């Protein structure tokens, strides 16, 4: 994101400065990771963007990042990536619903507190509706316009994972990365970094010199303004290894007498990453119009106040809230200081008492520290801080929700198409079940997070906003009796009790092997030693022998995760679902093990539905719906990654149902990752760990679910393959059918290389899946009808000669 139209002002006044990257040698460069990632995405071709969307991992993204890092390494520049932290989703304070003049007077009185030139604003600057009664209205959840969008979350996680592999330092800000970068540069007597690479929004945080774009050895130049024509990739060999930077003081000199605060006011009116465009401003050159307004009225506050009676009340109130947040974030953006304390970067006496209205409830500094080190992701913590979160159902509403509305008829047309009506009803039920399953994960994670905290957090209501719809919200119940921690605290795994196959991964700094975790529970000696010998350990009664190594911390957390997700009993034995999972993981490739866990979770929760039968009177291959079986195999294939060659080619095949399922399983996997992190936080916060022995980087490298592989392209390939061979009946042999299918696949998907190799990998993956299913038959985890359909699908596959 960037300040709207400021790029035109910069070009018009010729304020872009270019320098050689070599002039920045031996320096530390702070990088706004979300901005940098957005720049890369805007430079991608449509084909590259499509590849990024349909693959769990992007080789193009990794290649671009590795090239950038290599160029910095060549110039001896140390990069420090700073990521956005807790999402600024929040529950607004009371909005008075009063009629007529009282409502208008209340709004204006409230807004007057935001005049930055008023001498009486100090402590009560952000008091909401001070003139009204406290209980006049009820609070309503509202979503903040934030620059950390949902679609960037998965990519940011990939970048963190890749930076760890490259041993590159990164930092997660408490809230906004821009505020933290500004503190790193200007907030201390000895700056932590020498320069910032970020968007023009940094001007709002007092940064007056910063880098806006860089040309590395690939000759790829990316503009800081996505809306400008220069956003497209350009080749510029003359500007090789250079960077473009901006001088805010020079900009100020061309504003015809505006003060710095008035210039920032103008930027806020234009529209930024933290504020929308003021509705009264029109045209292309927004910054000039905004400057004229500020010059005319003296401040943005007075300009907005002047038009209060012109705007319809809903528009004015909405913009009013957005403006307040923007002022709050730019002036009091909370950062982590050099002492590890999380505070606004201004003197305490100038901080408003009710700043929590916009930043949410404050957490212990210890939690912010673990966030900064990348140990704890921020979505669940954001829900606790704000009191609400965006319901994951919005992911599905783009697909099945729209279909459901299209399939529902009203009035005279109602019932004319019962097939579509039934499909819409089924889609709505499936959607609700998926949300319920995700909210169970959120309830578990929030219970684990709040248990060691103050009772205020334990009793805090968390509202799930149904697809950002405030009128269809649900309360997420996160109270368990007893707390989940009490049920799982018996897991205290000490290094002296570990089998060699469990400890070896930590020596190699690789993710723990989930199969090894489960098979260790078949050893009675290990099971006996896995129990904590001390009773009722916790924050008030820490163990005498706390966990002191990364292996002990990670393994204890993993076993608690498996118990909470019903794969392990409180007796530390495998459940009826744990045994099938163990069997499936036995011959599974290491990189696919977390995907198999997600696969069995969805199978257990009936989110992965078995193929259907044409007739229920018998159970034979002839009764199997080939179309349904093909769709089922394609869904299973989305858990399998696929390697593609560097060249890109547009994928013409679009399957909305498969796309919907891929989004469902990736969303579910990311929520399991959040739960895994909450369990880790519970272990640490309950003083089960010697905190001086925590190694954040090694924990990140060895904790599972950090990078769940999968690919939508893999599902497309497998579905197309089985569609072809099931229809090709005229060839002289099955092998000719198969070879013909391989040739067609390689023409339709030219970047995947050998279709035969990928189908072989899928069949191996399917084989491991079916081994788990067969074990589920022995443990009675899966019903007989579902088992029969899965076995028929397996028979059909091998009847094709594969």
Swiss-Prot record:
Keyword Phosphoprotein assigned: yes
A molecular function (GO) term: mRNA 3'-UTR binding
Protein name per UniProt: Post-transcriptional regulator mkt1
Family: Belongs to the XPG/RAD2 endonuclease family.
SMART domains listed in its UniProt record: XPGN (SM00485)
A cellular component annotation (GO) from this entry: cytosol
Disruption phenotype: Abnormal establishment of heterochromatin. Increased level of RNA-DNA hybrids.
Pfam families with a match to the protein in the record: MKT1_C (PF12246), MKT1_N (PF12247), XPG_N (PF00752)
BP term (GO), one: regulation of translation
Organism (species): Schizosaccharomyces pombe (strain 972 / ATCC 24843)
Keyword Phosphoprotein: yes
Functional description taken from the UniProt entry: Involved in post-transcriptional regulation of gene expression by 3'-UTR-mediated RNA regulation. Promotes interactions between mRNA and poly(A)-binding protein. Binds the 3' UTR of mRNAs, centromeric transcripts and antisense-rDNA. Required for the establishment but not the maintenance of heterochromatin at pericentromeres, and for the maintenance of small domains of facultative heterochromatin known as HOODs.
Signal peptide from the UniProt entry: none
Subunit description: Interacts with pab1 binding protein ath1.
Keyword annotations: Phosphoprotein, Translation regulation
